[in-house]
Amino acid sequence: MDGLMKWLSDVFAPKARKVFANPWIDTVASTMKKVLPIILTGSLIFFYNVFRSYLTFLPDLSPIANFSFGLLAIFVAFFITHEAMLKLGHGEYQINASLISVASYLMLCRPQVVDGVFQIDNGRIGAAGIMMGIVVGLFVAIVFHLYAKLHVLENNDTLPDFVSDWINNIIPITITLGLSMIFANVLKLDLYDILVSLFMPLQKGAQTLPGFILICFVPVIFYSMGISSWVFNAVTTPIFMVAIAENIEAVANGHAPMN
């Protein structure tokens, strides 16, 4: 046992800390902390609605939940790219890249325009789409990161600075939205359905007793070695949010919670 503890503290823990210090992993962990107030805001309204079901004179605050918890995937897509640009040292792209991440997310949701009305499945922009938000946010961050490494017009002396900034934003924006268009509109692929299919085994496994124990036990083990449990939120938060969203929908339809 002493040998195992020595190996964990002297060999495994330093290597694990180095892995979790990776800016891409740290980006996801940081995003989960950023969106927590939004999650709690929606949760507070759901808790309030429990009392409202008995005290019917209370006002309906559901719009607050719909535009906080109900837009969680969009917020995640924004914050993933925002945090990545910050941690990778590309502050000049921080806002534009984050906004394009939202645009790419909406495009990849494959919305429909019916009689001039923009329609999108509400479930895709809420908690159920959080994994897609992470993937899209990382995709946009990678495109902007790779472009930033080219240092285009960095030593330019002829063009005004604002023109150089325009060009350096137009190119990665066009590439990002172009690739999203090819995926969603040309190839007709549904990223949401693809990720749900890939994520479902993990989601179902987490609902079992062994899965639940692992979700609770693994972060505790790493925390004992000085590694913050926040780094595991990239995996656990999507699982929890999808399960919570399913429970909310089930109760709203008059059924018992399933998770």
Question: Where does each model-flagged region fall?
Answer:
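Signature of multi-pass transmembrane helix bundles
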Residues: 1-39, 45-228
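Membrane-interface interhelical connector segments
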Residues: 236-259
